[in-house]
């Protein structure tokens, strides 16, 4: 059944459910039932959603609390720098008895050597004796992800056994974990608990609800068991809680009792009016990331502001970075007000993304008159932009990121940017017309920024005109440049990039080390019957009409392409696979050639990103060429964002 047919059938079934008896509702598939309930609850038609509570339990199980995609991910300070290795006495926790020569070295030298161990080295090390096995585990399990997979369940079982049956004769796996991520993958969960839509479809309604309730209890028990282990992980430094399950008072108590210094709550649903439990003194967090919301089916739904306020009061004395996102409440956003007089003496990094405030007084808590803020990331919400315009210059501010907002206000944000000419990094992810870009960067044909090192701009038009490129080139201090144009989302790529024009216009940027192009597309001289438009370059994957497959396929691959007497359908699939493989390799060769040209123009260039590919510049006394870092394209820009954050956070 096609997608269109399935969607039409679902709509007809929903109409039947809405206009006829309850019996019609019971024959719908679980997906249709949930779709109908979500629609009616959001419209306010279902005034008492508790009557459907067994079925609504599936909402969290199947992640119906919609997670809106980030326009750009926010990197925590702890993620931008590698973890400091633990000393051996903290990992082994007992006197070292191993005779391995490695342990005769000073501890500081051991920590310098271990990063160079390969996976094979670590496997061999684990077989020598107890102490080397614990050292190997400290390298393997410094970062652990619990995602409900079989592997994560084995880790969880091992950690539980260490707590329930402690032994002084055995080293503990729990002592090795520095960074813990809790992120349930729904495919793993559904398979283990047998609640996929296909499995539920064959059950009667009572059996279906019993299966759902059992899965709900299993999920709650799983999350509680993780929280119960946190206090037994003595070296845990970072906790990333990326699970959509409800967050309870008991779970927060366990999190607060742990040794973490950085907490990321990204997506959990707060139970009714959850506040932090009473906690004497402060909570020594250095980094806090909040993207939390109330369940939209909860009749007692309230604002998350009291929860945020209570946690900020505890962490304020030591907090260095605060990230507050409003994506988890996008279905029913509310405006926040923080009436507590909270002071952040060491706060240096603030991110406010899709968070609405009732008034400007709440923002004053994060931007006081006396501040050491170095990095600020905000959208152009009307309240935020007006406050920043009135706030004016922040002498300590080095980095500013301006994201798009539905209630955009450009004039106030531009005024704030102009008030801070000392900026080293400027990221404007909001698409702007070329005239506005010129207004931001220059004044009376002179650059407004003398020390700008990193610049990220997005053109609202389908290309950067020569005048705007000339304006960018006037900022000769630039070392890192990221340009994007046209539509920023979806499959339509509107920027048919002109590399010759860009190289000619920007050649005065002699210190350029990083250059990035996103949403760039290319024209192909393909077959006349094929759609070769740049907008569909990455989707259609059209090859040049004079291209020879022999140049991009191996001998074995060419043999597969030879039309042997095989099934027609299989032959078509095989030819499509080889054609796509050929296109990817041809595309890689084109991007490598362009990047090599850029390295000839910009002699200090070290890294570039174009055509969704990341490349480094390999230089010797004999050559200077671009090389792919990885062969796979990065259409979601995951690797790009990670690299860009590392670079911009270390500018000076």
How should these model regions be labeled?
Residues 2-7, 30-33, 38, 44, ...:
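N-terminal adaptor/linker regions at the entrance to substrate-recognition repeat cores
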Residues 19-20:
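Intrinsic-disorder-associated, low-complexity terminal segments enriched in Asp/Asn/His/Tyr and depleted
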Residues 59, 189, 197-212, 399-401, ...:
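C-terminal capping region of solenoid repeat domains
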Residues 189-190, 220-222, 245-250, 269-274, ...:
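Short, solvent-exposed loop/turn at the beta-strand->alpha-helix junction
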Residues 253-258, 276-283, 302, 306-316, ...:
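A structural signal for leucine-rich repeat
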Residues 326, 345-354, 363-434, 453-456:
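Core solenoid repeat modules with strong leucine/isoleucine-rich periodicity
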């Amino acid at each position: 059944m096609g997608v269109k047919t399935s969607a039409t059938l679902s709509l007809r079934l929903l109409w039947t459910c809405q206009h006829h008896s309850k019996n019609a509702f019971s024959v719908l598939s679980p997906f249709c039932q949930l779709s109908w309930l979500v629609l009616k609850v959001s419209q306010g038609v279902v005034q008492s959603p508790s009557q459907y509570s067994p079925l609504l339990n599936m909402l969290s199980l199947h992640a119906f609390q919609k997670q809106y995609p980030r326009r750009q991910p926010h990197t925590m300070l702890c993620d931008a720098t590698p973890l400091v290795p633990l000393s051996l006495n903290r990992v082994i926790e007992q006197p070292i008895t191993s005779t391995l020569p490695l342990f005769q070295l000073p501890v500081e030298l051991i920590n310098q050597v271990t990063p160079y161990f390969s996976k094979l080295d670590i496997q061999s090390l684990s077989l020598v004796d107890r102490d080397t096995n614990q050292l190997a585990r400290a390298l393997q399990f410094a970062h652990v992800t619990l995602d409900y997979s079989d592997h994560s369940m084995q880790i969880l079982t091992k950690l539980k056994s260490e707590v329930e049956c402690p032994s002084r004769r055995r080293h503990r796996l729990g002592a090795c974990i520095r960074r813990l991520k809790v992120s349930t993958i729904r495919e793993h969960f559904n398979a283990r608990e047998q609640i996929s839509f296909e499995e539920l479809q064959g059950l009667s309604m009572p059996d279906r609800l019993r299966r759902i309730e059992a899965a709900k209890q299993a999920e709650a028990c799983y999350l509680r068991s993780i929280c119960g282990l946190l206090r037994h992980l003595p070296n845990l430094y970072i906790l990333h809680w990326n699970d959509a399950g409800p967050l309870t008072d008991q779970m927060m108590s366990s999190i607060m009792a742990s040794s973490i210094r950085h907490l990321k709550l990204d997506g959990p649903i707060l139970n009714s009016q959850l506040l932090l439990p009473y906690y004497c003194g402060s909570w020594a967090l250095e980094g806090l990331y909040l993207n939390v919301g109330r369940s939209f089916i909860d009749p007692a739904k309230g604002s998350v502001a009291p929860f945020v306020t209570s946690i900020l009061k505890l962490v304020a004395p030591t907090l260095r970075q605060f990230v507050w996102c409003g994506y988890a409440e996008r279905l029913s956003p509310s405006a926040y007000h923080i009436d507590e007089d909270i002071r952040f003496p060491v706060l240096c990094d603030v991110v406010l993304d899709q968070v609405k405030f009732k008034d400007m007084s709440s923002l004053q808590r994060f931007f006081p008159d006396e501040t050491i803020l170095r990095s600020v990331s905000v959208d152009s919400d009307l309240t935020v932009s007006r406050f920043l315009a009135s706030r004016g210059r922040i002498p300590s501010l080095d980095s500013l990121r301006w994201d798009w907002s539905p209630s955009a206000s450009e004039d106030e944000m531009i005024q704030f940017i102009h008030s801070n000419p000392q900026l080293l990094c400027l990221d404007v992810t909001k698409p702007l017309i070329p005239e506005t870009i010129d207004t931001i960067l220059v004044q009376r044909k002179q650059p407004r920024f003398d020390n700008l090192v990193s610049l990220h701009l997005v053109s609202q038009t389908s290309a950067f005109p020569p005048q705007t490129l000339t304006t960018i080139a006037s900022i000769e201090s630039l070392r890192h440049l990221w340009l994007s144009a046209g539509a920023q989302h979806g499959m339509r790529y509107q920027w048919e990039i002109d590399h010759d024009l860009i190289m000619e216009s920007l050649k005065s940027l002699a210190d350029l080390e990083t250059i990035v192009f996103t949403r760039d597309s290319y024209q192909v001289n393909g077959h006349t019957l094929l759609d070769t438009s740049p907008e569909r370059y990455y989707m259609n994957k059209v090859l040049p009409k004079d291209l020879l497959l022999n140049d991009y396929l191996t001998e074995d691959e060419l043999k597969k392409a030879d039309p042997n007497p095989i099934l027609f359908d299989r032959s078509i699939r095989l030819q499509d696979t080889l054609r796509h493989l050929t296109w990817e390799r041809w595309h890689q060769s084109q991007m490598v050639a362009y990047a090599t040209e850029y390295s000839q123009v910009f002699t200090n260039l070290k890294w570039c990103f174009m055509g969704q590919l990341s490349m480094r510049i390999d230089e010797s006394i004999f050559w200077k060429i671009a090389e792919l870092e990885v062969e796979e394209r990065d259409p979601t820009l995951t690797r790009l964002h990670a690299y860009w954050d590392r670079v911009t956070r270390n500018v000076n």
